[in-house]
Amino acid sequence: MPSSNNKDNFLDKAFTVIAEGIVKMMPIAAKEKQAYIYYREGFAAQNNGDYSEALENYEESLKLEENPVDRGETLKNMAIIYMSNGDEDRALETYVKALDQNPKQPSCLKNMGLIYEKRGRSAQQRGLQDESDIWFDKAADVWTKAVRLYPGGYLDIENWLKTTGRSKIDVYL
């Protein structure tokens, strides 16, 4: 019986073949097709944990991609990598760029809030209550926006907003 890993590998390869066929048939310019290919390669590398290769492919995709929604998605994935690598400042900058391209990405706002909330907890542990409140307020601001974009999708965040008294909205749905 094949292992789960073999099944996943087969599915990845099958998806890649199908996606390549679709891209070839799509009635779009060669530049846009190449941008998508770089994006897809970056996404595959990211899923395999090869973050440097993923970032290289995402950078190439951004050079070619003109669609703001697609650019926003690429930037969001880059920010996730920066966040995973512990480069929170760069992640925040990149999330802002992603939102500039496509403001309807609640996951960007959610992840920005995670960074702010983490910084708030850190300041709180060091006894810096004023600084902690600033970070928690920033988290509340972006999380409120995320909840408005994706009602019911972030129940843990809705609960945090309510229990900390930072909820700016009465009804989330």
Curated annotation (Swiss-Prot):
Keyword Zinc listed: no
Domain of life: Bacteria
One example of a Gene Ontology biological process annotation: photosynthesis
Main location: membrane
Membrane topology: Peripheral membrane protein
GO cellular component: plasma membrane-derived thylakoid membrane
Keywords annotated in UniProt: Membrane, Photosynthesis, Repeat, Thylakoid, TPR repeat
InterPro entries per record: PSI_Ycf3_assembly (IPR022818), TPR-like_helical_dom_sf (IPR011990), TPR_rpt (IPR019734), Ycf3/AcsC/BcsC/TPR_MFPF (IPR051685)
Transmembrane regions listed in the UniProt entry: none
Renumbered ranges of TPR repeats: 35-68, 72-105, 120-153
Compartments where located: Cellular thylakoid membrane
Chain's role: Essential for the assembly of the photosystem I (PSI) complex. May act as a chaperone-like factor to guide the assembly of the PSI subunits.
Family: Belongs to the Ycf3 family.
Protein's recorded name: Photosystem I assembly protein Ycf3
Natural source organism: Prochlorococcus marinus (strain MIT 9211)
Lineage, opening ranks: Bacteria, Bacillati, Cyanobacteriota, Cyanophyceae, Synechococcales
Gene name as annotated: ycf3
